[in-house]
Amino acid sequence: MDRATIEPAIKLLLNEIHTRLTEATRIAKAAEACALAGSSAEGVSVSMDIEQLIYEADRLQGAAALLNRLSGG
C-alpha cells in the first residue's frame, strides 16, 4: 500500500489513541482522589470507565501497527 495514503490514517489513529488515554488518565486521577478521600469503593466505581477506553486504544494501536506493516514501514 502507498505510504502517502496510509500516513494520514496512521496519524489519525495515533491521535485517537492519545485522546482515549488522556481521558483514561483523567478518570484515573478522579478515582485516585476518591480513594485518597477515603472512598475506595467510589474510586473503583469511577475507574470502571477506564476499561473500555483502554480496550479501544488497544484496538486502534493494532490498526495503526497493521497499516504500518502493510505500507512497508
Protein language model annotation of sequence segments:
Residues 1-34, 66:
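N-terminal acidic leader/helix
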Residues 30-70:
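Short, charge-rich amphipathic interface segments used for partner binding and complex assembly
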